[in-house]
Amino acid sequence: MIDRREIDVLRSLLESNAETTSTDLIERFGGDTASLQSVIESLERDGYCFEQKAGTIRLLSEPDAVRPQSVGARLTTHTIGREVYVFRETRSTNDLARQAGVGKASEGVVFFAEQQTAGRGTHGRNWVSQGNQGLWFSILLRSTLPVERWPVLVQMAALAAAEAAETWIDDPIAIKPPNDLVLGGGKLAGFLLETCNAWNFQVLGIGMNVRSAPQIEGYPTSALDDFARKRVPLSELAAGILNRFEDWYLRKTVEWVAEAVANSKFPL
């Protein structure tokens, strides 16, 4: 579990245009110079780079990978992303979320993997999840929607992912019902909803090709970076999807979502 202070310090640096004083951080989050330095050193061990001089701290760069600190520092959510876990490798993030659901974890926990060895799509198909080449993650939900309306959760995820991705590109993204996003004629992202009625939870899996897309014969694919105006930061994109998903999930009615998909600016 990531030290919450790492997220708070990183958020403060991002909000202050990457630089602030050590005194300000200590006043905001408590502790002393030694405890603040411990937080900075922990972040540095995880790939963050800082410049410290004359009592100021400047964030120079973040890891080119999904990190819970970078995602958490950009979240504006109340439920989705309340806990964020990142695994270098796992069989399937949906399996991790399912285990958490059975263990009575709170709604909104998110599991990311840099690489999945047994990721899956709809109808049991294999989902190729190459190391650090995209976003592969699952959200634990405890929706009170009637069972017959659970598929709308996939529509919410598709809208959220399309909205987040479009901020980096000029080309149109299309929602291809029931489970895909299409960009440039190839599959950009897919969504998988798995449910467990006995334990009253749903697992929403999301996969998006970002750095590159797997080459699959007879099945066109696309990667976001190939269309982006600049290299897309994975953690920033992930936070954007989670922020938008919560907006759809907590604030929009099922009818509103259905209308949004039907009249979407992301038509196929």
Identify the residue ranges that each predicted region occupies:
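Short loop/edge segments at beta-strand edges and connector loops
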Residues: R88, I175-P177
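Residue-level marker for buried hydrophobic side chains located in beta-strands
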Residues: F111, P177, Q202-L204
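N-terminal lobe of the biotin/lipoate ligase/transferase fold
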Residues: I2-E166, R231
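Solvent-exposed beta-strand sheet faces enriched in polar/charged residues
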Residues: E51-K53, K176, E194
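Long, positively charged amphipathic alpha-helical accessory segments at protein N-termini or as interdomain linkers
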Residues: M1-D46, L145-I173, L183-L268
